[in-house]
Amino acid sequence: MSIIKKPDLTDPKLRAKLAKGMGHHYYGEPAWPNDILYMFPVVILGILACDVGLSILEPSVIGEPANPFATPLEILPEWYFFPTFNLLRVIPNKLVGVLSMASVPAGLITVPFIESVNKFQNPFRRPIATSVFLVGTIVAVWLGIGATMPLSKAITLGLF
């Protein structure tokens, strides 16, 4: 925003130009019809051309072909399900595992109410939300890495 020059609407010369319909370069071009009718189709066609060009020039295979007669030793979910998969795998009681997964969104919902007295947007001035974010990220990465290891090393990652 610091690069864009904001118009001084108290300037009588600018007001006179605006009254005549001139001077639109002073405050930018209107979105309709310039951007919507002309720029959006150009951008969409450019992205489409890049996609088609890349798919023709570099037709890479997505993974290895499936073999219906060979079963993998351990079936793993997609990478974004690794933390929840590992959590369900290491907790012996499945009800406790499901409740622990349900406690994550419930805990995140309570954070704004705990910090409702704090009106700052700076994350360093909101210690509870920042701590919850950092601890949650570290735990999720830890559980995600542990999901790719055997069950005996799933929590310790073989470090301890």
From Swiss-Prot:
Name the predominant localization.
plastid
Keyword Plastid on entry: yes
Q: Which GO terms describe its molecular function?
A: electron transporter, transferring electrons within cytochrome b6/f complex of photosystem II activity; electron transporter, transferring electrons within the cyclic electron transport pathway of photosynthesis activity; oxidoreductase activity
Domain of life assignment: Eukaryota
Report the GO terms under cellular component: chloroplast thylakoid membrane
Annotated compartments: Plastid, Chloroplast thylakoid membrane
Q: Does the keyword Magnesium apply?
A: no
Q: Which UniProt keywords apply?
A: Chloroplast, Electron transport, Membrane, Photosynthesis, Plastid, Thylakoid, Transmembrane, Transmembrane helix, Transport
Checking Gene3D superfamilies in the record gives: plastocyanin oxidoreductase (1.10.287.980), Single helix bin (1.20.5.510)
Per the UniProt record, which residue ranges are transmembrane?
A: 36-56, 95-115, 127-147
- Please, one GO biological process term? photosynthetic electron transport chain
Membrane topology for this entry? Multi-pass membrane protein
What SUPFAM superfamilies does the record tag this protein with?
Answer: a domain/subunit of cytochrome bc1 complex (Ubiquinol-cytochrome c reductase) (SSF81648)
Family to which the UniProt record says this protein belongs: Belongs to the cytochrome b family. PetD subfamily.
Q: Main role?
A: Component of the cytochrome b6-f complex, which mediates electron transfer between photosystem II (PSII) and photosystem I (PSI), cyclic electron flow around PSI, and state transitions.
- Subunit comment: The 4 large subunits of the cytochrome b6-f complex are cytochrome b6, subunit IV (17 kDa polypeptide, petD), cytochrome f and the Rieske protein, while the 4 small subunits are petG, petL, petM and petN. The complex functions as a dimer.
Q: Which PANTHER family match?
A: CYTOCHROME B
Official protein name in the record: Cytochrome b6-f complex subunit 4
What organism does this protein naturally occur in? Gracilaria tenuistipitata var. liui
Report which gene this protein is encoded by. Answer: petD
